């Protein structure tokens, strides 16, 4: 049963929206399913707001503010079907007009802080299923200068020579659940970006699966260019960009929260040496990892021994499907969707719902050879950064169902 006290703020907000619209039209605003919105400011709302929104709908609003400005979106009211993972009825907010860089997903009555795009476009999408419904949502968008109170917003474009960024509610309260913030830092072409976290407290997890901060070289979320993924209460070591752009992504799930963080950046001349770290989580110390050498990669590419014989000498053992591969610096970097994990060790495992994956580095890019879309049994070592390390003598073979019984038996083996 929805609380009657929700109607008081709802009515006040509707009255405010009505008053604003009367400056242009004497009629009360009518909220429809999606639309194209341009200008300095305006309101969007679920279809029929403040009435109950219809079932089985998908509505998309595309917002554009003047060039050179960013979009700031403030939810004034939200009442959607509640679910811990927002699987049924939800509102998604995207950077730009495509389903690429999602800033956040929201449901229930949780009202997030201000959401900011990195450019002059933002997309809002609401999806409802066939069952429980609520009164929907109403939000106000406005145009702002890229740096206007930038450290108070959740994300945005940062292009001044120095500045700060912090989690919503910092330092007064814990950051809210269910938020994604994306800060895009852009320096002049001939400069680099140095990044430091002053205070840092994000929900701890061995693999940073729930709440985390990820830092990327460039201007987009791209796992191949990820510098690090961080959680816990130890500030990451200072980071220096490879070029003139960094992207910082903060994500909190819908459960535990923590104090949050504040970080600072400064531009510096490109001529200084850089010390960009390899991808890490705060659970593990920083490492440069193994590098391919002529001597190492001239070894015979041939596995030796058996499944049983290699089990105890391997840090991790898994069966999985290779889903992405990229060659960089003479090594192959692969993402493997895990079918089953038999020995985990310190391997960093990412989890999205029921799907688990791990990132592996084949130090010599073609030895052993991994092909995208194929299933393998993979045994290897784990670097200090949590990535699997596959050497020329690592034990890898095609995964077949008949191997399952033996692997299950090895899982209980005492080494």
Swiss-Prot record:
Disulfide bonds: 33-59, 86-107, 154-181, 208-231, 297-364, 301-367, 312-415
Location in or out of the cell: Secreted
Entry keywords, A to Z: Disulfide bond, Glycoprotein, Heparin-binding, Repeat, Secreted, Signal
Residues glycosylated per entry: 355
Tissue expression pattern: Highly expressed in the heart, trabecular meshwork, pituitary gland, bladder, mammary gland, trachea and placenta and weakly expressed in the brain. Expressed in cartilage.
GO MF annotations, alphabetized: collagen binding; heparin binding; peptidase activator activity
Domain NTR span(s) in chain numbering: 297-415
Signal sequence extent: 1-23
GO cellular component: extracellular region
Domain called CUB: residue spans: 33-144, 154-268
PROSITE patterns, alphabetized: CUB, NTR
GO biological process, one term: cellular response to leukemia inhibitory factor
PTM per Swiss-Prot/TrEMBL: O-glycosylated; contains sialic acid.
Function: Binds to the C-terminal propeptide of types I and II procollagens and may enhance the cleavage of that propeptide by BMP1.
Known partners and oligomeric status: Interacts with heparin with high affinity, and type I or II collagen.
Protein name per its UniProtKB record: Procollagen C-endopeptidase enhancer 2
């Amino acid at each position: 049963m929805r609380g009657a006290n929700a109607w008081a703020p709802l009515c006040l907000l509707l009255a405010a929206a009505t008053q604003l619209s009367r400056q242009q039209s004497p009629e009360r605003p009518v909220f429809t399913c999606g639309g194209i919105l341009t200008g300095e400011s305006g309101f969007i709302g679920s279809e029929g707001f403040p009435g109950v929104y219809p079932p089985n709908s998908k509505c998309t609003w595309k917002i554009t503010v003047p060039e050179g400005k960013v979009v700031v979106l403030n939810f004034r009211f939200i009442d959607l079907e509640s679910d811990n993972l927002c699987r049924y009825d939800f509102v998604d907010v995207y950077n730009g007009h495509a389903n690429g860089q999602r800033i956040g997903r929201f449901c229930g009555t949780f009202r997030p802080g201000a959401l900011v795009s990195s450019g002059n476009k933002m997309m809002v999408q609401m999806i409802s299923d066939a069952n429980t419904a609520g009164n929907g949502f109403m939000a106000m968008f406005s145009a702002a200068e890229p740096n206007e109170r930038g450290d108070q917003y959740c994300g945005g474009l940062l292009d001044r020579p120095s500045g700060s960024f912090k989690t919503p509610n910092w330092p007064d309260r814990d950051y809210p659940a269910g938020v994604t913030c994306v800060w895009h830092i852009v320096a002049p072409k001939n400069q680099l970006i140095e990044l430091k976290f002053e205070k840092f407290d994000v929900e701890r997890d061995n693999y940073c699966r729930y709440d985390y901060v990820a830092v990327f070289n460039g201007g987009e979320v791209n796992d191949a260019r990820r510098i690090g993924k961080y959680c816990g209460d130890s500030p990451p070591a200072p980071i220096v960009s490879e070029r003139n752009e960094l992207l910082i992504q903060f994500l909190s799930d819908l459960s535990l929260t923590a104090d949050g963080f504040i970080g600072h950046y400064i531009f510096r001349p490109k001529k200084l040496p850089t010390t960009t770290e390899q991808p890490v989580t705060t659970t593990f110390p920083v490492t440069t990892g193994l590098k391919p050498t002529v001597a190492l990669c001239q070894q015979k590419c041939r596995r030796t021994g058996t499944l049983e014989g290699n089990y105890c000498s391997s840090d991790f053992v898994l069966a999985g499907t290779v889903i992405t591969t990229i060659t960089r610096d003479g090594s192959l970097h692969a993402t493997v969707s895990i079918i089953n994990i038999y020995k985990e060790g310190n391997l960093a495992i990412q989890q999205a719902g029921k799907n688990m994956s791990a990132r592996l580095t084949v130090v010599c890019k073609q030895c052993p050879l991994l092909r995208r879309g194929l299933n393998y049994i993979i045994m290897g070592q784990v670097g200090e950064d949590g990535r699997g390390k596959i050497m020329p003598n690592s034990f890898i073979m095609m995964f077949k169902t008949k191997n399952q019984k033996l692997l299950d038996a090895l899982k209980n083996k005492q080494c």
